[in-house]
Amino acid sequence: YWSLGDKGHYVKTKEGKTFHMPNSGAIFRCELDGTKVDRYSSGERNAQELAFDSFGNLFSMDNDGDYPGEKERALYITEGSEHGWRLNWQWLRKQDFTKISGISAYNPWMEEKLFLPDRDDFAAYITPTIGNFGPGPCGFTNNPGTALSKDLADCFFMTNQQNQIRVFKFLPKGASFKFEELKPIKGGIGNTGLAIGPDGALYSASWGSGKGFIFRFDTESEKDHHPARSETQKRLGLSSKEQTIETLALWLDSPDQRVRMKAQFELVRLGDL
């Protein structure tokens, strides 16, 4: 799965499909060999990174258009979902008519408050955000299950322009989700990408001040580590091709998403799943 920004796209696949949206971002996906390219969702503005929870639900944190009063959006992304943003709405305030007449052009995004969560009079043609936040999301990743500490096992992490790493939980709400924000982690300078290492620590890429950095974040003490963290690191270092079917089946019950996926992919390769 990967995201495209709102400058639009025109994609023709080898299977004969055409995906064309000149003024919208989108989420695409394909098989590992590059076949079966498919547009999974549309209407994102700048959803830079994607992350799945332990049940396969897909989320992203989308940047806003920098209008006064507008806010960034937390997105729950489902197959075929349309999230509403169009590139041309970015420039309505800069059009010649607006500049010459002094009369603001009608902007559905702001006038109809399409960036806010669902409500009684919300437009029915788009999938609304599950919550607002700000400002400047960039890196975004999930805890695969055993990283850091047990109380952060089902959390998501996001970098922003305030040099923080913000912490979120996505909680079921009807057929969708809501999000809850926890205490942020203080980051470095200009944090961008995020990744969970096989050692269970959280890593952040940083830029600025003429130098690049990699920051590592972890619990204050090893006694606070998730109890399955060391076992997860051990399993991640093993070759799945050298494991028995029984061992791979055991891995499917791991509390860590990476171990489960490792076992699943190998069992599929062997034709046993």
Where are these regions (language model features)?
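Alpha-solenoid HEAT/Armadillo repeat architecture
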Residues: 252-253, 268
